[in-house]
Design a protein with these regions (language model features):
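Motif-centric detector for short Cys/His coordination patterns
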Residues: 1-123
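Active-site environment of non-heme Fe oxygenases that use a 2-His-1-carboxylate facial triad
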Residues: 102-129, 133-139, 144-370
Length: 370
């Protein structure tokens, strides 16, 4: 969070904020919209009691008086006058909205950093730390989860609300020869994100191991942020193409066909890479001129090489009673092949939306003593 203070020069009607030593001049319209009086803002919900869209676009500050570093009194040309606290406008200077910044990682990430015992999450302080860790690294591994069917739903509700899809409220991952998805067969699955053909894409996936009697079937996780950073060093134009040009993703089943178009690299509101939509089994090259198609494909191919590079891959065996939760936009997942004749390998999975852990984190941040 920035170090903030008000500054109003004597005799001036200009309101400035000093943010980490930088002077930011506040627009009269921006400031007027953020009035804090109880007749304009509901204190409980923090929802406005007036329509800011109806404000005069040419509104001006008639006078501004600095009470101290944290408070100013401002009079506007529409007749409104009120006090402004620096605390009230501070969130607008935090482009991460109070959330921890992502920490990009590679294969040298210590799995212990993202591992928590599920029963320990009964403590709000531990739950807060677990969610903070998830938001930083994009993944969690939970141990001591009851190895019973549908336990995953209870875990999911700890972090958010279950997202129902055409696969149901949850789905079983085991070998099925005639399945509608390769995930249900014992073949190797390269790094990918789930459901890029869906709108919106399920933001978070949970996979819970009930039984794993095979010697194969190792789980893999890859942080797309590290791979994109490397690609940007090698081919900045390629990153630009992958983040600006939409590709078609398509899923076909007996009773449903889903098609969505979106860029392979997703950017956040600041224009920074936030993740990917990546599934070579499901995407199609966009219709472009030949030169752009070749440049796009080279970037796509190189990104795939980085995703499959062991230097970027976290590789582990998910045991019965363990659950991994990961940001389906940021962290790609995969699996080594396994022999179903060795024994049973049974996982259950489900999805929740991205805003679940974020909302819980911000709520806990207000109440948990740090």
């Amino acid at each position: 969070m920035s170090q903030l203070s008000f500054r109003v020069d004597p005799g001036s009607a200009i309101v400035n904020v000093i943010a980490n030593g930088k002077v930011v001049t506040l627009s009269p319209l921006w400031l007027r919209e953020r009035c804090q009086d109880k007749e304009y803002l509901d204190s409980k919900t923090q929802q406005r009691l007036f329509d800011p869209h109806a404000l005069d676009p040419n509104i001006q500050v008639l006078s501004a008086e600095q009470v101290d570093d944290t408070r100013v009194r401002v009079e506007f040309s529409d007749g409104y006058a009120g006090d402004y606290s620096i605390l009230a406008i501070a969130p607008d200077f935090d482009l991460d909205d109070g959330l921890p910044s992502p920490k990009a990682w590679t294969s040298d990430l210590d799995p212990g950093k993202i591992k928590f015992s599920y029963p320990s999450l009964d403590s709000k302080a531990v739950l807060f730390k677990a969610i903070e860790t998830y938001l930083e690294y994009g993944a969690l591994i939970l141990t001591d989860v009851p190895a019973e069917p549908e336990s995953i739903l209870q875990v999911a509700e700890t972090f958010g609300h279950v997202r129902v899809t055409n696969f149901g409220k949850y789905f079983d991952v085991m070998s099925r020869p005639d399945s509608n998805d390769l995930a249900y067969r014992p073949v190797r699955l390269g790094p990918h994100t789930d459901n890029p053909y869906r709108e919106p894409v399920p933001g978070i996936q949970l996979l819970h191991c009930l039984v794993n009697e095979t010697s194969g079937g190792y789980s893999t996780l890859v942080d797309s942020l590290s791979a994109i950073q490397k690609l940007a060093e090698e081919d900045p134009r390629g990153v630009e193409l992958l983040s600006q040009i939409s590709v078609k993703f398509r899923f076909v089943d007996g009773d449903i066909e889903l098609i969505e178009r979106r860029p392979m690299i997703e950017l956040d509101h600041q224009g920074r890479p936030a993740g990917v939509h990546y599934s070579p089994r499901l995407d199609y090259l966009p219709l472009l001129d030949d030169a752009t198609t070749v440049a796009f494909h080279k970037a796509r191919r190189r990104l795939g090489e980085l995703f499959s590079d062991p230097a970027y891959e976290l590789y582990f065996r998910l045991q019965a009673g363990e659950l991994m939760m990961f940001d389906n936009n940021r962290v790609l997942h995969g699996r080594t092949s396994f022999n179903p004749n060795e024994g049973l390998r049974h996982l259950q999975g489900c999805y929740i939306d991205l805003d679940g852990p974020r909302g819980r984190y911000l709520s806990l941040k207000r109440t948990v003593a740090l």
